[in-house]
Structures are given as C-alpha cells and as structure tokens.
C-alpha cells in the first residue's frame, strides 16, 4: 500500500520547471469543491507537483492535504493567512531551469523541515511535562533546567578516562569557533558562571548571539586584566589576575542556593621563555586551575579547565573526571578541556559521572584523541555528544516509573526496543505526548522499526488519550492551542505522518470530524487496490450490501490497508453522536468548534455517516481476517461500540 505523499505546491513562476520533471503534476483551477480536491489528491501514490489557485483554502486544509509551499517569493496568500513559503528557491536556480538543482534544493530544505515537527511537539510539552525521555540536544536547547528533568540514552562522546578506550573517528561537520563551542556544550543548568581568562569578552558575546536564552539565565563573573566593561547587567567584570581561590570566593554569595560552574582558560604570554620554561609554565597554569576548582568543590557543581598536552612527558597526572576534545579546534592544537565533576549544588543529577580525582594521563593516547577529533572541518557532532553526555541523565524511558507528567519523543521504536511492544504501548498510555515510528518506507538515517498502524490505533486510543499520525497531531495542536503551535509553522507533514503520536487530551466536545481526525487521503484508491489484488477481502461487505445490510467500508479499509493512523474512540463518537444530527446541527457544531474539514458529502448531510451495526460488522470482519495476526484486542472495541 502507498505511504504518505507530499503535494509540492509551486507558484506560477516555477510551473515551467516542474513540467520537465518525472513526478506527477496536478493543475489546480481554484474552482474545485472539497470533495473533488479530496478525490483527486487521493489518486497520487507519490509526491506530486501542484500549481494553480489555492487562495480559497485555509492553511490547515492545505496542510491536511499535504501541501508544502515552494516559491521564489517570500509569501503566498491563502484564505486565512499570508503563508511564509516552506522552500524559498533562489532565483538563479529558477532561471537555470536545472531540474536536479531545483529538486536538490527542495530535498535539502525538507530534511531541515523535519525539525519543525519535533519542535512543535516540544513547545507544547515544555508547558505540560516535567520528565523528557529519549532526549537529545534539541530538548536541552529549550528546556528549563530548574523545572524539567531530561533523560535519555545519548551516544557516548569521545573522552579520555583512565583505563578506557578513547573511541573511533566518525563523520563530522564544521562547528563554531572553539571557545564559543566550549560555552555551547558546557553551559546548561548553571545559574552562575565564574570564567577566568575570559579575554576581551568576544567569546561570551558570540555565545549570547548564538544562544540568547541560555546566556540571559546565567550571572557571569568574568576575570581578566584586559576585559572591558559590559553593558549586559548579568555580566560582572573583574579586572584581576586569579592566583588562588580567595580571588573567586569573595565574589560569591553563599546565602543563595544556585548552581555554579567554574571555567579556567588561563594562558600567559610566552615572552622570552625557552621551550622548557614555556612548557613548565603552561603545565603549572593548568594544574593551578584544577587545584583552585578542587579546593572550591563544595561551591561548584562542575568545572572546565584548560588542558595542554605536554611535549616532554610520556605520562603525567591531573585532577579530572574526563578529558574532552575541543570541537572547532585546529587539527594541530594539542589542547583538551578537563571536565571536573564537583560536589556543589546542581539542578541536574550527574551522579553517573565520577567525582573528579587524580588521574594518570598517557600522552600518546590523548594526542591520538586530538588527531582523531580536532580540525576546522569537524566538531559539530562531537559538540552535540558532549552537550548530551554532560547534561542528560542516562535512563531508559521504557523502564522508568514515575508519577511526573512525561514526554516520550522519538525513541520508543529504536531498534534496541524491538520485542518490547507491550512496554511501548504502556508508555504511550501514560505520556503527555509520545511518538512511535509507523512508516513502511526504507529508513536511511535512523535505526527504527515500524509498529503496524492498525495495531497502534486499536491499542492506543482511550477516553483521555488521542492517537493520531504526526500531521494530525500538529493540525490538532494548531486547532486547540493556536498560541503554542502557530498556523505559519514550517514542517514536513509527509515525514510527520510516518509517526503515530499519542496525546493526553480528551475527545473534543462536540466530537466533530476536524481535519486532524478525518483526512483519509486515498481511501477510495486503497479500497480499489484491495479489490483488484485480493477480491476475497471485500466479499463479506459485498454480500451484506446485497442483503440490504451494511458494513462500514471506511473503517474496514482503514484497518485492512494499514495506511492510516487516526483516533478510533473520537471517530466512533463522531459517527454515533455528531453525524447522527441534522445538517444544520452538524454545521453549527463545526462553526462553534472552529473545526475545519476536507471532505463533505452533501448527500450525507442530513443522514448519519455510518450506523453502530455497520461499525460492529466492520470490526468483526477485520477480526475474522486478521485476528490471529493482530496484536491488539478487537473484542474490547466491539464491547465499547455496543454501549457507546
């Protein structure tokens, strides 16, 4: 059966380019009715180019159809908003009429658009959840460390610890300048940072530009003889040389219970020193930083110390938890960072990291780490791994028990959880929002397995849990929480539809057939495909209709095709309560709810869309055909339908 497709809508100046491509082309006249648009879109099994007039449709209707907006212009006028385009095509690409360049531009942008889906879910969760499971750097970037507990199983970064392997080289990409990268991975939960050797403040000003939220929530004490005054009220400049802990302690208020971070980046001028003198000076400076940090260990949660690798020592000792490579450093910079876990107050439980202690360092091993991971063409993924390793509490969400509101995004169907499907469904039942992969297309970038869509629908829907595909979830949040998920959101709906999303939400009252619930693009085609490939699947339905009885083909094909994820509890309530009303009452409820639809049959406006017995018949037939293979209980739904 076909997987979700995108409608790649191009504005008129690009329509000539798409005609030279190989994807289907859909010309829109602007006079199509709701049903015609629904039927026409349902005939496509691959991504399709479209052009023409869409000004009478709203953004949610077009997103429900899977529209991605592509133009050389900045905006497109729709019925309810002026939409910022999703893919802005450079004019030189449009002029060149190079189809490969055009499609590469779309593809690259769509990869980046995937992030919009996860970000929208997190925006809702940051207001509702306390615990975040399966977390990566994206969650840390926007989490509040004073409120949120961030759990996950992130990949280990390269690091040096006594008696352990360093790791192997992996593909990487360029990142920020090394000192900005340092702040980017070390600053998360600290409320007060004491930064010795800050220089001219350029580094923290660049960090402010890169991450204004994290910069603002820190009180910065910066120490350097040449540091200029700062106009930022949270930056306090101390024009001193730091020689002992006294120079730091006198600037600390111990009546405040805050998390503190100590950064030491001291390097004196070489002046007239020879090689031996210079190496001894550098070695002493780095050890002094460690000693000062260790002596103040009760006041600081952690420290990050400059660590230059000696040229003339095969082995040496330092006080450390881990030695870390420097993302963004030059390939020949034989300098690391020394992370020390200390004993001061912390918002993050870092007990899984060893306390800082005396550690023997083998010079050739740490030089090897420089050679593996340093370089201007590298550092982005190393930095992310360091960020995650230092600030995410290592815990498997599938095994975690807690009464706190929780979020479970993008990890439940990692291949390591295969065989734990009952636990996955239990987590989805408890979570504020959870995601599971249901896509059947090959996965090139992720190591996930797919849950069957029909099983997810039958297992996931409860009176207080909605189960929708990812596009439906975003459309639901746009509808119910427009202040959190904006209509102008850019995301790739076709990518989102590869996920089932559970949301701890009640059934809307009245239970209207909003776009978030009812899209079923291509349902008629799915039915025909079942018939032409295996007509026995339709025999019972055909026979019942000949007898004057009915079976809900809509429900039956939805389950048999495995092509859709929608909320059964809400859908049944919609059919039995809302669709049983008159046309006038139906329209009144839609208007009162501010709901929108993409399918409306005028001939069914005054009639119920299905009746209870036809739904029961469809479930019974699905059980007869698939009951042995179906992992979910169908009998519980039959019982519910009898009493709903």
Swiss-Prot record:
Localization per record: Virion
Domain of life: Viruses
Record's keyword annotation contains Cell membrane: no
Cysteines engaged in disulfide bonds, as pairs: none
Keyword Cytoplasm: no
Record's keyword terms, sorted: Capsid protein, Outer capsid protein, Virion
Gene3D superfamilies: Orbivirus VP4 core protein, C-terminal domain, Vaccinia Virus protein VP39
GO cellular component, as recorded: viral outer capsid
Coiled-coil region(s): none
Protein family per UniProt: Belongs to the orbivirus VP4 family.
Function description: The VP4 protein is one of the five proteins (with VP1, VP3, VP6 and VP7) which form the inner capsid of the virus.
Protein name: Core protein VP4
Organism field: Bluetongue virus 2 (isolate USA)
Gene transcribed to yield this protein: Segment-4
């Amino acid at each position: 059966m076909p997987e979700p497709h995108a409608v790649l809508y191009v504005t008129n100046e690009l329509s000539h380019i798409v005609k030279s491509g190989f994807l289907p082309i859909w010309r829109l006249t602007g006079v199509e009715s709701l049903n015609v648009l629904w039927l026409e879109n349902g005939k496509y099994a691959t991504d399709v180019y479209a052009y023409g007039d869409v000004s009478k449709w709203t953004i949610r209707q077009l997103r429900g159809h899977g529209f991605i907006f592509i133009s050389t212009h900045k905006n497109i006028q729709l019925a309810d908003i002026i939409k910022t385009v999703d893919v802005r095509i450079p004019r030189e690409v449009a002029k060149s009429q190079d189809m490969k360049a055009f499609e590469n531009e779309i593809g690259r942008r769509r990869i980046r658009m995937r992030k919009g889906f996860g970000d929208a879910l997190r925006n809702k969760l940051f207001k509702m959840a306390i615990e975040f499971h399966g977390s990566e750097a994206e969650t840390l970037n926007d989490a509040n460390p004073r409120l949120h507990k961030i759990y996950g199983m992130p990949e280990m970064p390269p690091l040096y610890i006594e008696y352990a392997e360093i790791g192997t080289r992996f593909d990487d990409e360029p990142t920020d300048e090394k000192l900005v990268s340092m702040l980017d991975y070390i600053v998360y939960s600290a409320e007060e940072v004491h930064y010795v050797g800050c220089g001219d403040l350029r580094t923290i000003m660049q960090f402010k530009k890169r991450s204004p939220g994290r910069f603002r929530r820190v009180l910065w004490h910066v120490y350097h003889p040449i540091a200029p005054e700062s106009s930022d009220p949270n930056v306090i400049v101390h024009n001193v040389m730091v020689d002992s802990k006294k120079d730091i302690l006198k600037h600390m208020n111990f009546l405040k219970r805050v998390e503190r971070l100590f950064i030491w980046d001291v390097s004196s001028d070489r002046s007239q020193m020879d090689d031996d003198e210079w190496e001894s000076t550098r070695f002493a400076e780095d050890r002094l930083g460690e000693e000062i940090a260790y002596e103040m260990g009760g006041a600081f949660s952690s420290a990050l110390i400059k660590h230059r690798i000696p040229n003339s020592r095969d082995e040496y000792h330092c006080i450390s938890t881990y030695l870390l490579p420097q993302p963004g450093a030059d390939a020949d910079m034989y300098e690391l960072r020394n992370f020390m876990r200390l004993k001061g107050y912390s918002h993050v439980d870092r007990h899984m990291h060893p306390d800082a202690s005396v550690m023997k360092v083998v010079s050739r091993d740490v030089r090897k780490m420089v050679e593996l991971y340093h370089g201007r063409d590298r550092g982005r993924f190393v930095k992310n791994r360091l960020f995650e390793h230092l600030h995410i509490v290592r815990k498997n969400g599938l095994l975690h028990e807690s009464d706190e509101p929780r979020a479970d995004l993008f990890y439940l169907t990692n291949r390591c959880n295969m065989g734990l499907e009952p636990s996955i469904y239990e987590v989805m039942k408890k979570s504020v929002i959870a995601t599971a992969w249901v896509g059947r297309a090959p996965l090139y970038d992720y190591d996930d397995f797919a849950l069957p869509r029909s099983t997810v629908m039958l297992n996931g829907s409860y009176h207080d849990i909605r189960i929708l595909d990812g596009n439906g979830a975003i459309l639901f949040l746009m509808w119910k929480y427009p202040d959190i998920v904006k209509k102008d959101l850019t995301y790739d709906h076709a990518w989102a539809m590869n996920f089932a999303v559970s949301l701890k939400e009640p059934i809307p009252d009245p239970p209207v057939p909003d776009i978030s619930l009812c899209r079923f693009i291509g349902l008629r085609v799915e039915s025909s495909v079942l018939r032409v490939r295996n007509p026995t699947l339709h025999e019972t339905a055909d026979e019942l209709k000949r007898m004057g009885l009915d079976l809900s083909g809509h429900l039956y094909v939805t389950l048999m095709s495995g092509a859709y994820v929608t909320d059964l509890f809400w859908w049944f309530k919609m059919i039995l309560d809302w669709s049983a009303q008159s046309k006038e009452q139906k329209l009144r409820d839609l208007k009162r709810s501010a709901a929108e639809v993409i399918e409306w049959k005028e001939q069914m406006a005054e009639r119920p869309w299905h009746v209870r017995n036809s739904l029961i018949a469809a479930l019974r037939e699905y059980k007869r055909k698939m009951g042995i293979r179906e992992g979910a209980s169908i009998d519980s739904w039959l019982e519910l339908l009898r009493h709903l």
